[in-house]
């Protein structure tokens, strides 16, 4: 079953098939005579008499009209087995780390989500060891979590910290999808995981910035297929990390434009909701295991109402918003406690004490936010005694939400800290109840637990009796 190329326009290739026409999403193969390698195409549109329009998942340099295209009769497929752990692969499951070819059951990357009757919602908490997350936006195991932020506010660093903390502390399987991000960052992550000894329990799938849009659009599906294998066949709880899901949307926008579809709001593809649903709805907890997905989401121009972040929001269980104004204060991770949220921050899931402490922390920060205009005009001295206490505690809460990260210790020279959830609750409870009103603000900056705060205050000789 062969066809002939009749047109090449960048990554878009039109092919004529005299007999049977390929199915939508079927993978096609053409031999590149200049590079002596196989180029994979994906069927996207059937048009005219026996013609198809396909998107190339590689460079079309050397591809010309008249070349023979072969059908494969299946979608893009990848080999899945335990051999993929510790390896770095591309969208086709081929090694790009210089290692041996991966053997395993060849599985199509385009498929339906798990059957409705197999879905089992999970409400257990995935402890991250990061105070701002564990207190205000607890992650549900088997849930979907989004890290929202503009350029340079720390999304990738936080993703790498989560890999370090969750993979090291919990020892589970991790699958990382590098979608349209910098190749340098992918290389750094690979070396970091090698050094920390977690690479043997992780699979990395890369389709970076220099790849064609067809590849960037399929990398999340390859990573999901690998994660589903560990969940469904080996009964594992899998941590799936995607950096950056916005680049998946961008790739879809490029493909949509090349296929001649009329764009919708702000130039996005008209199929934006459908395309995101195809990825997000496959991230599920089932009767055999779970997939917990942490997704970095780039926010264009720091605008959370942009159609891409706004559509992604609707799929998530926890949303972590990183703020540029907080990053400018030197507080890292730059989590915005008032914009972030979690569906499981309720007493029945996290316990009464945790929910109550989190509520009071947010209440104090909201009160402080409402006083900022008065402070900037009249100064703190003009506030009532009660308001001054609120401001004092709010500033300490802000400082205490900062934390030294393991993956950033090489740059900050401050060793990273893993803070258990109980210690996090204990520390913030002490602040809101006024137990540490006599300690200076500086003592709360870039420390782990309440003990570290007291130790830092003593070292600076600032403890007041």
From Swiss-Prot:
Keywords, sorted A to Z: ATP synthesis, ATP-binding, Cell inner membrane, Cell membrane, CF(1), Hydrogen ion transport, Ion transport, Membrane, Nucleotide-binding, Translocase, Transport
Subcellular location: Cell inner membrane
SUPFAM superfamilies reported for this sequence: C-terminal domain of alpha and beta subunits of F1 ATP synthase, N-terminal domain of alpha and beta subunits of F1 ATP synthase, P-loop containing nucleoside triphosphate hydrolases
EC number from the UniProt entry: 7.1.2.2
Pfam family, one: ATP-synt_ab_N
UniProt topology in membrane: Peripheral membrane protein
Positions that bind ATP: 149-156
EC class (word): translocase
Keyword Transcription regulation appears in the UniProt entry: no
Molecular function (Gene Ontology), one example: ATP binding
Reaction(s) this enzyme catalyzes, per UniProt: ATP + H2O + 4 H(+)(in) = ADP + phosphate + 5 H(+)(out)
SMART domains the UniProt entry points to: AAA
Entry GO terms, CC: plasma membrane; proton-transporting ATP synthase complex
Function: Produces ATP from ADP in the presence of a proton gradient across the membrane. The catalytic sites are hosted primarily by the beta subunits.
Family (UniProt): Belongs to the ATPase alpha/beta chains family.
Protein name: ATP synthase subunit beta
Organism this protein belongs to: Dictyoglomus thermophilum (strain ATCC 35947 / DSM 3960 / H-6-12)
Gene name of the record: atpD
């Amino acid at each position: 079953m062969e066809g002939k190329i009749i047109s090449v326009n960048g990554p878009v290739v039109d092919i004529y098939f005299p007999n049977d026409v390929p199915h939508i999403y079927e993978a096609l193969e053409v031999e590149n005579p200049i590079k002596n390698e196989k180029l994979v195409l994906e069927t996207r549109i059937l048009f005219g008499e026996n013609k198809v329009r396909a998107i190339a998942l590689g460079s079309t340099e050397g591809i010309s009209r008249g070349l023979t295209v072969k059908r494969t009769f299946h979608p893009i497929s990848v080999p899945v087995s335990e051999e993929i752990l510790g390896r770095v692969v591309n969208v086709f499951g081929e090694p790009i780390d210089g290692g041996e070819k991966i053997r395993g059951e060849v599985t199509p990357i385009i498929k339906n989500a798990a059957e409705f009757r197999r879905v089992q919602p999970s409400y257990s908490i995935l402890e991250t060891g990061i105070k701002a997350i564990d207190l205000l936006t607890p992650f549900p195991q088997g849930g979907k979590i989004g890290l929202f932020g503009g350029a340079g506010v720390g999304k990738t660093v936080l993703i790498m910290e989560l890999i370090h903390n969750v993979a090291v502390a919990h020892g589970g399987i991790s699958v990382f999808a590098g979608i349209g991000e910098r190749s340098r960052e992918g290389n750094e992550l690979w070396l970091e995981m090698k050094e920390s000894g977690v690479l043997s329990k992780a699979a990395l799938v890369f389709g970076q910035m220099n790849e064609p849009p067809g590849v960037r659009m399929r990398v999340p599906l390859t990573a999901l297929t690998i994660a589903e294998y560990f969940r469904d066949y080996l009964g594992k709880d899998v941590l799936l990390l995607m950096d950056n899901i916005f680049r998946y949307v961008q790739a879809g926008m490029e493909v949509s434009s090349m296929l001649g579809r009329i764009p919708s709001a702000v130039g996005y593809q008209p199929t934006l909701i459908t395309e995101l649903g195809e990825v997000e709805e496959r991230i599920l907890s089932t009767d055999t295991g779970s997939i917990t997905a942490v997704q970095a989401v780039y926010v264009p121009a720091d605008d959370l109402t942009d159609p891409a972040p706004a559509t992604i929001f609707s799929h998530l269980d926890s949303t972590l918003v990183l703020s540029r104004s907080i990053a400018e204060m030197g507080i890292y991770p730059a989590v915005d406690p008032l914009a972030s949220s979690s569906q499981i921050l309720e007493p029945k899931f996290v316990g009464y004490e945790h929910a109550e402490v989190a509520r009071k922390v947010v209440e104090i920060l909201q009160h402080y936010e409402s006083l900022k205009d008065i402070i900037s005009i009249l100064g703190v001295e003009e506030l009532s005694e009660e308001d001054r206490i609120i401001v004092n505690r709010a500033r300490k809460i802000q400082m205490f939400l900062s934390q030294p990260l393991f993956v950033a210790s090489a740059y900050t020279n401050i060793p990273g800290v893993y803070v258990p959830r109980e210690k996090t609750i204990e520390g913030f409870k002490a602040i809101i109840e006024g137990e540490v009103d006599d300690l200076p603000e500086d003592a709360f900056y870039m420390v782990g637990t309440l003990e570290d705060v007291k130790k830092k205050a003593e070292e600076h000789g600032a403890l007041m009796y």
